[in-house]
Curated annotation (Swiss-Prot):
One of its GO terms (cellular component) is plasma membrane. Regulator of mitochondrial fusion: acts by forming homo- and heterodimers at the mitochondrial outer membrane and facilitating the formation of PLD6/MitoPLD dimers. May act by regulating phospholipid metabolism via PLD6/MitoPLD. InterPro entries: Miga. It is a single-pass membrane protein. Pfam families: Miga. It comes from Homo sapiens. One of its GO terms (biological process) is mitochondrial fusion. The gene is MIGA1. One of its GO terms (molecular function) is protein homodimerization activity. Keywords: Membrane, Mitochondrion, Mitochondrion outer membrane, Phosphoprotein, Transmembrane, Transmembrane helix. The modification Phosphoserine is found at residues 289, 293. This is Mitoguardin 1. Homodimer and heterodimer; forms heterodimers with MIGA2. Interacts with PLD6/MitoPLD.
Length: 632
């Protein structure tokens, strides 16, 4: 039996049951230990599963009886390792993706700001306009939607004066980008830190500080314009009966009529007009040139002022002001200095005389033959009509004094006579008919017929502005800007000499006046005297504006510019006071005297230049004659 049960090559010790081979005993012991280890590991896994998943006790006994095959064990291990690897890779890619998000992409707004800032910093000769462009270009990608809502939702009545929403947003985007970059500086690499430094360089330059100030000023203008146009928008949208003003957590609801009163609108219009003037001065002083050259401009202005105070003002200095541009600019500088110290913001905002006129305009009681709103830079037709009503009453106060009437008549005679003399004509006949016209207007018996004649032409107010400035001067300037085709053909014909062209222009003017004389209803009325004056002055003005660019042309242009500037001044809150009739009349008279003095000074300088040229030519002829006599 022992032979059957024993394996070949193995002998058993009697009574012990141990194999005779010692190495086999060691292998059996190791196998037993490995089985115990596997069972213990299975037990520990089962215990961990029970603890983690909180399984019932019955599940424990069922789990203890489950046995996995080696293939299942391998699949379980591979699945666990794969799951852990996938989780690790997902976490790794998520961190990498977050880092990429922190960096600025080339098409993102911040990168646009940095690129344009680098370009502005690298260009040494960049001017004020280029820096403005660099700042505003960043808006197109950062504040596109916000600016569109702001611009289109609020209406654009005053959009021609400022487009400040985009410009301000561009400056804010630069500042916000700079602050955010500094706050997250730990997540930026070295190249990005260099970009942040480049952003800070141009913002702190005087040029860009000036631009930022202008952007904020334009933003204030835009807000005031929105406030002024709010009533029009509210009328279009009647559903919005009230507005909400947020102040922290509190919301106040007030009626629109209580917030935007008529007095507030008038004060806001005055403030806006002052702001527009200030904006134009900024652009004229610094906008078209480099701000670094402002000191040079100030030095030049100082030199002009110092030259004006020198007592020994020789012939050469006198002749230097004969040109229209230099003389007008110097006069405007002096005038601006005087006005700057005369009026304050309080006087501009408090204009009861103007407010009363605005009430009359709202009631439809003010009439004007021609609305010159845009030409005189008024805020609207209502603003123009209200100021016109005040100006009419002020001129009545001025003309009520005989000294003022004499001054206006003498000034008109001198200026128009100088134009005729400049055209190489004799002003004697003109002065005679001019005196007859003044005598006719002084007779009160003719005022009724004069009023009827002017009313037939649309002039319903016998006033210095309506008759002289608007009907006579401004209409004449407009007619000369668009002359008849026949006159244009004669003037533009290169085969005709200047004398023939001048005669043709004069003949055309006389033929037009002859036709108008035939249509007169009163043979010796206002228009009869007026056409008699036009027979002498109209050909001179027509040839002066349409003829060659000579000294007569310069004089006519200077005369026209002074009239236009005077009209703009009297419709400007900065130059005149609309607080009362007396103050407005005083300011109008001062402006009349100033413009008249400028014209007279120009005429004297031109006459002096003409005299000096004649003397120089005469001296040259005399010296040539003496030289010839010596040679003989």
């Amino acid at each position: 039996m022992s032979d059957c049960c024993s394996a070949p090559g193995i002998s058993w010790e009697a009574g012990v049951g141990r194999p005779a081979v010692p190495g086999l005993e060691l292998q059996i012991r190791r196998g037993a230990m490995s089985e115990e280890t596997v069972s213990e590991s299975q037990f520990s896994l089962k215990t961990a599963a029970l603890r983690v998943f909180d399984l019932p006790l019955t599940w424990y006994y069922s789990l203890s009886q489950i046995k996995f095959s080696p293939v299942a064990k391998k699949l379980f291990v591979v699945t666990a390792v794969s799951a852990i690897s996938v989780i690790f890779l997902a976490h790794h890619f998520k961190r990498k993706r977050g880092k990429k998000k922190g960096k600025i992409l080339p098409w993102e707004p911040e990168h646009l700001i940095l690129e344009y800032t680098k370009r502005a910093a690298s260009d040494k000769g960049s001017s004020c306009s280029s820096s403005r462009q660099n700042l505003t270009l960043s808006l197109s990608s950062t504040k596109d939607k916000g600016s569109q809502v702001c611009n289109y939702a609020n209406g654009g009545l005053f959009s021609k004066y400022s487009g400040s929403a985009q410009s301000l947003a561009s400056v804010q985007s630069v500042n916000s980008c700079h602050s955010c970059a500094c706050g997250n500086s730990n997540s930026w690499d070295k190249a990005d830190e260099d970009d942040i430094k480049l952003v800070n360089i141009p913002v702190t330059t005087p040029e860009n500080l000036y631009l930022m100030g202008m952007e904020l000023f334009e933003e204030a203008l835009r807000r005031w314009e929105q406030a002024l146009t709010f009533r029009n928008r509210q009328a279009e949208d009647e559903a919005c009966g009230s507005i909400k003003l947020g102040a922290g957590d509190a919301i106040a609801e007030e009626n629109v009529d209580d917030i935007i009163s008529t007095e507030f609108i008038h004060k806001l219009e005055a403030l806006l007009q002052r702001a527009y003037r200030l904006q134009e001065e900024f652009e004229a002083t610094l906008g078209a040139s480099d701000p670094n050259s402002l000191a040079d401009d100030i030095d030049k202005d100082t030199d002009i002022t110092m030259k004006g105070n020198v007592e020994d003002f020789g012939l050469r200095d006198t002749l230097s002001i004969a040109s229209t541009d230099s003389f007008a600019s110097a006069a405007e500088l002096a005038e601006h200095r005087e006005v700057r110290h005369t009026y304050s913001l309080e006087s501009l905002c408090h204009c009861p005389f103007y407010e009363e006129a605005m009430h009359l305009v709202e009631e439809g009681k003010i009439y004007s033959r021609v609305l010159r709103t845009e030409m005189l830079e008024c805020l609207g037709d209502s603003d123009f009509l209200a100021k016109l009503h005040c100006i009419r009453q002020a001129f009545q106060v001025i003309l009520s004094e005989s000294a003022n009437r004499i001054f206006l008549a003498e000034s008109g005679r001198k200026i128009l006579s100088a134009l005729i003399v400049k055209a190489r004509k004799n002003p004697k006949k003109f002065e005679d008919v001019f005196d007859e016209m003044i005598y006719f207007l002084e007779q009160t018996d003719h005022w009724g017929s004069t009023e009827m004649e002017l009313a037939a032409r649309g002039v319903k107010n016998l006033n210095f502005y309506d008759v002289v400035l608007d009907f006579i001067l401004m209409d004449s300037f407009e007619d000369l800007e668009n002359p008849p085709t026949s006159i244009q053909n004669v003037v533009n014909n290169r085969w005709l000499n200047s004398s023939f062209k001048e005669t043709a222009v004069a003949s055309s003017c006389w033929s037009v006046l002859k036709q108008k004389r035939q249509q007169m209803k009163i043979p010796d009325g206002f228009f009869a005297h007026f056409y008699a004056i036009c027979e002498h002055i109209s050909p001179v003005l027509a040839w002066g504006f349409l003829g060659p660019r000579n000294s007569l042309y310069d004089l006519c242009c200077f005369f026209k510019n002074q009239v236009l500037l005077f009209l703009k001044d009297i419709f400007d809150f900065e130059k005149v006071r609309y607080s009362s009739t007396e103050t407005l009349a005083e300011d109008l008279m001062q402006l009349l005297i100033r413009r008249t003095e400028l014209l007279m000074a120009y005429l004297e300088a031109d006459a002096l230049r003409h005299t000096s040229s004649c003397l120089s030519s005469h001296g040259h002829v005399m010296s040539t004659g003496l030289l010839e006599a010596k040679v003989q």
